[in-house]
Amino acid sequence: MGQDKKNLTAAAAAAYVDDSTTWESFGLDARLLQAIDQLGFENPTLIQSSAIPLAIEEKRDIIAKASTGSGKTAAYSIPIIQNLLQDESTEREIKSIILVPTRELSNQVSQFLEKLLIFCNSKIRLINISSNLSDQVINSLLINKPEIIVSTPAKLIQILEKNVNSNLINLSTVKNLTIDEVDLVLSYGYLEDLQKLESYLPIKKNLQTFLMSATINDDLNDIKSKFCSRPAILKLNDEDSNQNNLVQYYAKTTEFDKFLLTYVIFKLNLIKGKTLVFVNNIDRGYRLKLFLEQFGVRCCILNSELPINSRLNIVEQYNKNVYNLLIATDETNDFTIQEDEKDEGEEIEENKNEENDGKTSKNTKKPNQKKDKEYGVSRGVDFRNVACVLNFDLPTSSKSYIHRVGRTARAGKSGMALSFVLPLNEFGKHKTASLSTAKKDEKVLRRIVRQQSNNGFEIKPYQFDMKQVEGFRYRAEDAFRAVTQSAVREARIKELKNELVNSDKLKRFFEENPQDLASLRHDKELHPTRVQTHLKRVPEYLLPESARADHKKIGFVPFHKNKVHKNRKRKPSGRKPDPLKSFRPK
């Protein structure tokens, strides 16, 4: 099982592993131990060795703070399953609720739980009600009273309110409540849903609670007071282990030069490994994709307009190295702007101006734009082996920046983050390439630098050698002119149609034929209105000297080649001699 076992191994860095503890020391069920061994977990991580005994033996509530890749999911999943296996009750009841902020994360948590339940799935059943299932299918699954429910807060409340007068879903029997990525759950505006959930749960009884997050702040106090009693607070001090793994840069550039530099970076393969590019809106993502496609740079898009099945498949294929370049739309900025201003302590007048700007920007948003409110990629989703995070558009808050760069340098691996920053005096000079949020780039950068400095991290300025890049400018301008607003709109419609077809295939055909899933790709070219095939080839004279191929000098080559045939006998010049005149008698 060698190679498969390595592929299933959780992304826990060596710095997080607790070699002094074994899984057998927790007294886990044999079926659970067998599943853990099949996953390739040799030893528990530090957060697991601290949380699991407290949760199983002492039945304590757990509030855990640890970095991405430290094993937080297993830290709450294993105690939940162990307690359910020890439960001698024979009645089918809903006993555990796991809440996550996004549908993508709910899918990943469900897949991980299914691997842990592989040897005991007849006793413990699991349902992910945030998956793309109809209400009728979900209701039919809930009738069987699954022991574990994974959901987003909004979806769970929706089902509870629809079935308030029926006995379809009863949470009075729940013994465990888990909120994963609790800080993001709050920033997504789920606090009201959590308050509604309080009335459905047996909080005054023996309800065990897990609150897991990479950051812990004052916003957590309200949740802690509602759902926890005498919690054990675990903080894994892993800043030192992460500090040397992530290298952060920012580059000040103009609006159009963002596209120019991105073209040069990916066409010349200046970044080795997989890259995650963040943009601030959906149109921006398609504009960048159409721009890069003209140079033969293949990439795929991830945004809230795509069907959930397609989004999950894109993340899965990206993690399997099917794609090396993913353009993700981060639409969480609106939730964090005001929070970030309060946390960073900006001046009152500056806050007022920014709030007013925020209001006007909200009013100018396009109506009737259907988006999935439970979409999120900048935090929580497990992007594996990301070598670089490129902030093509700088986020509007330092919190969002932390969430983005947290997708790389995970689990002890090295990574790099590069952010493009637009100086204020360059804003609006290139209207087609302009973005409204870029007006505050310098202000946001100051907050980011200050916050990272307080945490012991450094963001270094990076200066591109524009003399080397200048030769590519005319090609970039030619390609950018082809990406018109109508081309972007047509690309969005075409992509949505393709993904709707793909989503239907994923839902039906590929469930029965998983081996054919590899044939479904999401990085197909969308083509702008004007296709210019010559742009896909980079002439050698544009390359820097270090990147040019070494050719032997062959000397001077004349324009006209002498027509000399070496193998043909040389003809005598002039007329042939007359044999009568040349004949001489002896």
Swiss-Prot record:
EC class (word): hydrolase
GO cellular component term of the entry, any: nucleolus
Family matches, as InterPro entries: DEAD/DEAH_box_helicase_dom (IPR011545), DEAD_box_RNA_helicase (IPR050079), Helicase_ATP-bd (IPR014001), Helicase_C-like (IPR001650), P-loop_NTPase (IPR027417), RNA_helicase_DEAD_Q_motif (IPR014014)
Motif segment (DEAD box): 180-183
Bias-annotated ranges (Basic residues): 560-574
A GO BP annotation: maturation of LSU-rRNA from tricistronic rRNA transcript (SSU-rRNA, 5.8S rRNA, LSU-rRNA)
Biased composition (Basic and acidic residues): 350-360, 575-586
Chain segments carrying region Disordered: 339-375, 560-586
The record's note on its domains: The Q motif is unique to and characteristic of the DEAD box family of RNA helicases and controls ATP binding and hydrolysis.
Similarity field: Belongs to the DEAD box helicase family. DDX56/DBP9 subfamily.
PANTHER family for this protein: ATP-DEPENDENT RNA HELICASE RHLE-RELATED (PTHR47959), DEAD-BOX HELICASE 56 (PTHR47959:SF21)
Name of this chain's protein: ATP-dependent RNA helicase DBP9
